[in-house]
Amino acid sequence: HNDGVCVPRIRKLMDWSEYLQTLGEDSILLNPIFESDNHGYDTRDFKTIDCRLGTNEDFKEVCEDLHKHNVKIVLDGVFNHVGRGFWAFKDVQEKKWDSPYKDWFHISFDGNSCYNDGFWYEGWEGHFELVKLNLQNPAVVDYLLDCVKMWIEEFGIDGLRLDVAYCLDHNFMRRLRSFCEELKPGFALIGEVLFGDYNLIVNDEMLHSCTNYECYKGIFSSLNCMNMLEIAHSMNRQFG
Protein backbone atom coordinates (compact mmCIF):
# COMPACT_ATOMS: atom_id res chain seq x y z
CA HIS A 1 0.00 0.00 0.00
CA ASN A 2 1.25 3.50 -0.83
CA ASP A 3 1.31 5.37 2.47
CA GLY A 4 2.39 8.63 0.81
CA VAL A 5 5.48 8.97 3.00
CA CYS A 6 8.53 10.17 1.08
CA VAL A 7 11.65 8.10 1.82
CA PRO A 8 14.65 8.41 -0.57
CA ARG A 9 15.33 4.67 -0.72
CA ILE A 10 16.39 4.82 -4.37
CA ARG A 11 19.53 6.73 -3.40
CA LYS A 12 20.88 3.52 -1.85
CA LEU A 13 21.72 2.41 -5.39
CA MET A 14 24.62 4.85 -5.33
CA ASP A 15 26.19 2.75 -2.58
CA TRP A 16 26.46 -0.11 -5.08
CA SER A 17 27.49 1.64 -8.29
CA GLU A 18 31.23 1.20 -7.76
CA TYR A 19 30.73 -2.46 -6.85
CA LEU A 20 28.67 -3.01 -10.00
CA GLN A 21 31.49 -1.52 -12.06
CA THR A 22 34.00 -3.77 -10.29
CA LEU A 23 31.92 -6.80 -11.24
CA GLY A 24 31.95 -5.67 -14.85
CA GLU A 25 28.20 -5.08 -14.90
CA ASP A 26 27.28 -2.63 -17.64
CA SER A 27 23.54 -2.26 -16.99
CA ILE A 28 20.90 -2.41 -14.29
CA LEU A 29 17.20 -3.27 -14.67
CA LEU A 30 14.81 -1.67 -12.20
CA ASN A 31 11.29 -2.73 -11.34
CA PRO A 32 8.60 -0.02 -11.68
CA ILE A 33 9.66 3.18 -9.93
CA PHE A 34 6.84 5.59 -10.75
CA GLU A 35 4.02 6.63 -8.45
CA SER A 36 1.57 3.77 -8.01
CA ASP A 37 -1.30 2.53 -5.87
CA ASN A 38 0.57 -0.44 -4.40
CA HIS A 39 3.24 -2.60 -6.04
CA GLY A 40 4.44 -0.45 -8.94
CA TYR A 41 2.57 -2.14 -11.78
CA ASP A 42 -0.55 -0.11 -10.92
CA THR A 43 0.76 3.29 -12.00
CA ARG A 44 -0.78 6.59 -10.91
CA ASP A 45 1.63 8.97 -12.61
CA PHE A 46 4.30 8.06 -15.17
CA LYS A 47 6.16 11.33 -14.65
CA THR A 48 6.69 11.20 -10.88
CA ILE A 49 8.98 8.86 -8.95
CA ASP A 50 7.05 7.00 -6.24
CA CYS A 51 7.46 8.86 -2.96
CA ARG A 52 8.35 5.57 -1.24
CA LEU A 53 11.54 5.64 -3.33
CA GLY A 54 12.25 9.38 -3.25
CA THR A 55 11.89 12.23 -5.70
CA ASN A 56 12.64 12.85 -9.37
CA GLU A 57 15.75 14.73 -8.29
CA ASP A 58 16.91 11.72 -6.23
CA PHE A 59 16.57 9.43 -9.23
CA LYS A 60 18.29 11.91 -11.51
CA GLU A 61 21.33 11.88 -9.20
CA VAL A 62 21.24 8.07 -9.12
CA CYS A 63 21.27 7.92 -12.93
CA GLU A 64 24.14 10.38 -13.14
CA ASP A 65 26.12 8.30 -10.65
CA LEU A 66 25.45 5.01 -12.44
CA HIS A 67 26.43 6.50 -15.79
CA LYS A 68 29.61 7.85 -14.22
CA HIS A 69 30.43 4.22 -13.36
CA ASN A 70 29.56 3.07 -16.92
CA VAL A 71 26.34 1.37 -15.83
CA LYS A 72 23.30 1.82 -18.07
CA ILE A 73 19.75 2.08 -16.72
CA VAL A 74 16.81 0.05 -18.01
CA LEU A 75 13.39 0.91 -16.58
CA ASP A 76 10.26 -1.20 -16.39
CA GLY A 77 7.78 0.23 -18.90
CA VAL A 78 4.29 -0.70 -17.75
CA PHE A 79 2.23 0.43 -20.74
CA ASN A 80 -0.48 -2.22 -20.94
CA HIS A 81 -2.37 -1.07 -17.87
CA VAL A 82 -2.46 1.47 -15.04
CA GLY A 83 -3.79 1.57 -11.49
CA ARG A 84 -7.24 2.73 -10.47
CA GLY A 85 -5.53 5.80 -9.03
CA PHE A 86 -4.21 6.84 -12.46
CA TRP A 87 -5.17 10.48 -12.99
CA ALA A 88 -7.05 9.94 -16.27
CA PHE A 89 -9.05 7.00 -14.89
CA LYS A 90 -9.99 9.02 -11.82
CA ASP A 91 -11.36 11.67 -14.18
CA VAL A 92 -13.55 9.02 -15.80
CA GLN A 93 -14.74 7.84 -12.39
CA GLU A 94 -15.78 11.39 -11.56
CA LYS A 95 -17.24 12.58 -14.88
CA LYS A 96 -18.30 9.32 -16.54
CA TRP A 97 -19.49 10.06 -20.12
CA ASP A 98 -18.30 13.65 -19.90
CA SER A 99 -14.67 12.73 -19.26
CA PRO A 100 -12.36 13.49 -22.20
CA TYR A 101 -10.36 10.40 -21.15
CA LYS A 102 -13.14 7.79 -21.38
CA ASP A 103 -11.67 6.46 -24.65
CA TRP A 104 -8.25 6.00 -23.04
CA PHE A 105 -9.59 2.73 -21.62
CA HIS A 106 -11.83 -0.15 -22.70
CA ILE A 107 -15.05 1.02 -21.05
CA SER A 108 -18.74 0.17 -21.36
CA PHE A 109 -21.34 2.35 -19.68
CA ASP A 110 -23.87 -0.45 -20.14
CA GLY A 111 -22.39 -2.38 -17.23
CA ASN A 112 -20.75 -1.96 -13.84
CA SER A 113 -17.43 -2.89 -12.28
CA CYS A 114 -16.75 -4.92 -9.18
CA TYR A 115 -15.87 -1.58 -7.56
CA ASN A 116 -19.34 -0.16 -8.40
CA ASP A 117 -17.91 2.58 -10.63
CA GLY A 118 -21.09 2.90 -12.65
CA PHE A 119 -19.37 1.48 -15.74
CA TRP A 120 -17.56 -1.70 -16.77
CA TYR A 121 -13.92 -1.67 -17.86
CA GLU A 122 -11.36 -4.21 -18.97
CA GLY A 123 -8.70 -5.17 -16.45
CA TRP A 124 -5.50 -7.01 -17.28
CA GLU A 125 -6.32 -10.73 -17.36
CA GLY A 126 -9.26 -10.20 -14.99
CA HIS A 127 -7.32 -8.15 -12.43
CA PHE A 128 -9.53 -5.09 -12.15
CA GLU A 129 -7.07 -3.17 -10.00
CA LEU A 130 -5.05 -3.01 -13.25
CA VAL A 131 -7.00 -0.92 -15.76
CA LYS A 132 -6.15 -1.79 -19.36
CA LEU A 133 -5.10 1.14 -21.55
CA ASN A 134 -6.43 1.58 -25.08
CA LEU A 135 -3.17 1.54 -27.03
CA GLN A 136 -5.05 2.04 -30.30
CA ASN A 137 -6.05 5.52 -29.15
CA PRO A 138 -3.54 8.06 -30.60
CA ALA A 139 -3.91 10.28 -27.52
CA VAL A 140 -2.82 7.45 -25.23
CA VAL A 141 0.16 6.63 -27.45
CA ASP A 142 1.20 10.29 -27.60
CA TYR A 143 0.97 10.55 -23.81
CA LEU A 144 3.11 7.46 -23.23
CA LEU A 145 5.72 8.57 -25.77
CA ASP A 146 5.86 11.95 -24.06
CA CYS A 147 6.56 10.16 -20.77
CA VAL A 148 9.35 8.11 -22.37
CA LYS A 149 10.80 11.30 -23.83
CA MET A 150 10.84 12.83 -20.37
CA TRP A 151 12.58 9.75 -18.91
CA ILE A 152 15.26 9.91 -21.59
CA GLU A 153 15.81 13.66 -21.46
CA GLU A 154 15.57 14.14 -17.68
CA PHE A 155 17.07 10.90 -16.38
CA GLY A 156 19.08 9.70 -19.38
CA ILE A 157 17.74 6.14 -19.25
CA ASP A 158 19.15 3.67 -21.77
CA GLY A 159 16.36 1.17 -22.29
CA LEU A 160 12.98 -0.23 -21.32
CA ARG A 161 11.75 -3.64 -20.29
CA LEU A 162 8.15 -3.77 -21.53
CA ASP A 163 5.83 -5.43 -19.05
CA VAL A 164 3.51 -8.10 -20.56
CA ALA A 165 4.77 -7.27 -24.04
CA TYR A 166 2.71 -10.14 -25.44
CA CYS A 167 -0.40 -8.03 -24.66
CA LEU A 168 0.82 -4.82 -26.29
CA ASP A 169 -0.50 -3.50 -29.58
CA HIS A 170 2.04 -4.19 -32.34
CA ASN A 171 1.65 -0.78 -33.94
CA PHE A 172 2.35 0.80 -30.56
CA MET A 173 5.60 -1.15 -30.28
CA ARG A 174 6.61 -0.14 -33.81
CA ARG A 175 5.97 3.51 -32.96
CA LEU A 176 7.86 3.19 -29.68
CA ARG A 177 10.87 1.60 -31.42
CA SER A 178 11.21 4.33 -34.05
CA PHE A 179 10.54 7.08 -31.50
CA CYS A 180 13.22 5.87 -29.08
CA GLU A 181 15.81 5.20 -31.78
CA GLU A 182 15.39 8.72 -33.11
CA LEU A 183 15.56 10.23 -29.64
CA LYS A 184 18.49 8.12 -28.40
CA PRO A 185 20.31 5.79 -30.84
CA GLY A 186 21.15 2.48 -29.21
CA PHE A 187 18.16 2.62 -26.87
CA ALA A 188 17.16 -0.95 -25.94
CA LEU A 189 13.66 -2.42 -25.88
CA ILE A 190 13.23 -5.76 -24.09
CA GLY A 191 9.84 -7.47 -23.88
CA GLU A 192 8.37 -9.70 -21.22
CA VAL A 193 7.00 -12.64 -23.20
CA LEU A 194 5.63 -15.80 -21.61
CA PHE A 195 4.55 -17.86 -24.63
CA GLY A 196 3.75 -17.76 -28.33
CA ASP A 197 5.89 -16.91 -31.33
CA TYR A 198 8.58 -14.55 -30.07
CA ASN A 199 9.59 -13.64 -33.62
CA LEU A 200 6.34 -11.70 -34.03
CA ILE A 201 7.59 -8.95 -31.74
CA VAL A 202 11.37 -9.44 -31.67
CA ASN A 203 12.43 -8.06 -35.03
CA ASP A 204 13.81 -4.99 -36.78
CA GLU A 205 10.57 -3.03 -36.31
CA MET A 206 9.63 -3.75 -32.70
CA LEU A 207 11.70 -5.18 -29.85
CA HIS A 208 15.41 -5.96 -29.71
CA SER A 209 15.03 -8.87 -27.31
CA CYS A 210 12.63 -10.62 -24.95
CA THR A 211 12.45 -12.84 -21.89
CA ASN A 212 12.42 -16.38 -23.26
CA TYR A 213 10.57 -18.21 -20.49
CA GLU A 214 9.90 -21.21 -22.71
CA CYS A 215 13.60 -21.94 -23.27
CA TYR A 216 14.43 -21.00 -19.69
CA LYS A 217 12.00 -23.67 -18.49
CA GLY A 218 13.24 -26.11 -21.11
CA ILE A 219 16.87 -25.67 -20.07
CA PHE A 220 16.47 -26.32 -16.36
CA SER A 221 13.95 -29.13 -16.87
CA SER A 222 16.16 -30.87 -19.41
CA LEU A 223 19.29 -30.54 -17.29
CA ASN A 224 17.55 -31.65 -14.09
CA CYS A 225 16.08 -34.71 -15.81
CA MET A 226 19.11 -35.32 -18.07
CA ASN A 227 16.66 -35.45 -20.98
CA MET A 228 17.18 -32.88 -23.72
CA LEU A 229 13.82 -33.50 -25.40
CA GLU A 230 12.06 -30.45 -23.93
CA ILE A 231 14.77 -27.89 -24.73
CA ALA A 232 15.30 -29.44 -28.18
CA HIS A 233 11.59 -29.10 -28.90
CA SER A 234 11.55 -25.44 -27.75
CA MET A 235 14.67 -24.52 -29.70
CA ASN A 236 13.37 -26.19 -32.85
CA ARG A 237 9.94 -24.55 -32.50
CA GLN A 238 11.41 -21.07 -32.09
CA PHE A 239 14.49 -21.15 -34.26
CA GLY A 240 14.31 -24.28 -36.43
Each language-model region and where it sits:
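An active-site-proximal structural segment forming one wall of the substrate-binding cleft
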Residues: 19-23, 65-71, 88-100, 104, ...
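Core domains of carbohydrate- and sulfate-ester-processing enzymes
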Residues: 69, 87-130, 218, 222-239
